[in-house]
Amino acid sequence: MHNIVCIKQVPDSAQIRVHPVTNTIMRQGVPTIINPYDLFALEAALGLRDRFGGEITVLTMGPPSAEESLRKALTYGADRAVLLTDRCFAGSDTLATTYALATAIRKIGKEYGPANLIFTGKQTIDGDTAQVGPGIAKRLGVGQLTYVAKVRSVDVANETIEAERRSEGGVQVLHTRLPCLITMLEATNQIRRGAMADALRAARAKIVKWSAQDAGVEDISKCGLKGSPTVVKRVFAPPARAERAALVESAEQPAQALIDAIFLNQPKLETDLATLARDARSGLSGQC
């Protein structure tokens, strides 16, 4: 089997900055990580390789600094890494991103053999659109299984796959033919730790780097901001809120504070309760 895993280097969401003119995320100087859902996708691919053998190629599109995330993926056990990097890709929305990645996946198929499965995370934590995986499948003309929790089985000879998808009503069991694209939810198994041998291999590995021309991109106008019809009207970070803490010396204090807060927001409630208490006392006095 040859499986391709698309990963993305994403900024630390706690330190995101936004360009005031283009409304795109400014990634320079911001700490980055591999998108967590993409790690779940990588773990699913590694699990299949454990069972069926084969190779795993990890692919990302981004600036030269994205090489760091690819090397991290190699430490988990991926066999090779491809970095699609070109200034013309800057500012890509999901439509432009899927065009570039689908083009690179076709090139990977020619260079290293066609993919049986293509994995992505269900979404990225910086965009949260969940559009890239399905968009790649559409451009490649392959089937897709989205929000997959577990790959149950793969029949390589008959080119079929069975997987589980979580839904509000329970678990759906899905069947489709290979090749197909899978977007993964949280991993059902814990993400493995890379072995020391994998870490050493990753440090020495040569990352394959392709420009738009190298990957076979035929229409540059479909890339980057030029190829992105999505208009972001405003991007902003929520204002930071100061956390306040109270020193509690007895169990009665928080209870009294809660009562005071309720009465402050609903002043009529205190009056109504006082009236009920007075009426109750009057009733008891009348019975004596």
UniProtKB/Swiss-Prot annotation:
Gene3D superfamilies, per the entry: HUPs (3.40.50.620)
InterPro entries: ET-Flavoprotein_bsu_CS, ETF_a/b_N, ETF_b, ETF_beta_N, Rossmann-like_a/b/a_fold
GO BP terms, alphabetized: nitrogen fixation
Pfam families with a match to the protein in the record: ETF
UniProt KW keywords: Electron transport, Nitrogen fixation, Transport
Function summary: May play a role in a redox process involved in nitrogen fixation.
SUBUNIT field: FixA and FixB form a heterodimer.
Family in the record: Belongs to the ETF beta-subunit/FixA family.
Protein name from the UniProt record: Protein FixA
Gene: fixA
